[in-house]
Amino acid sequence: MPTYGYRRVHAILKRQARAAGLKPANHKRIYRVMKAHGLLLNRHAGGIERRHDGRIAVDERNRRWCSDGFEIGCDNGERVRVAFALDCCDREAMSFLATTGGISGDDVRDLMVAAVEHRFGRVNRLPVTIEWLSDNGSCYIAGDTRSFARDIGLEPRTTPIESPQSNGMAEAFVRTIKRDYVRVSSRPDAETVMRQLPSWIAHYNEVHPHKALGYRSPREFIAAHGRS
């Protein structure tokens, strides 16, 4: 990926070397090679990073899920709106949906069902209660949505009003998708974006190295720690 720094490149190459039965190169060597060829990324010098006071990440899978949404602009002026659900331990994008309209309460409820079925199969109710963290968007705080969440075993939790950064893990996912996939892909219209979105999410889940996961992808982390 053209947006990967040397540590993520090293993680990818190490994964490939081990699959081929070869000794992986040292990360310092990767740094030197990338520097020699002008491939190192510039240090981020943007605005002040917003921080949250609470800890979003958890140590066990299926304890807390977070959800949020974002927009993707197209060259022709169309906009694609995406909503997603992440596990706050392994960072897997368990479910997502995209529309050219607004994200509705019905959409969020579909998102919940898709996440539950991805992790537990077709069940009427989760075997354990899982927190569902979101902001205070109308589609999330609607009475029907909160009631439905509890009916299937999710416990709705919302970030403090005017503090969306408290859902920092979801924000980090949005930044990753926009930086590593959206900005380097063709976006002539909504149809093209929506056609590419599943492959972006699949690559994120299967390949994208996370610093918090020891530079493993979500699926690598899941495989190493079991699927339960």
What residue ranges belong to the model's regions?
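Charged DNA-binding/catalytic regions of mobile-element recombinases
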Residues: 1-228
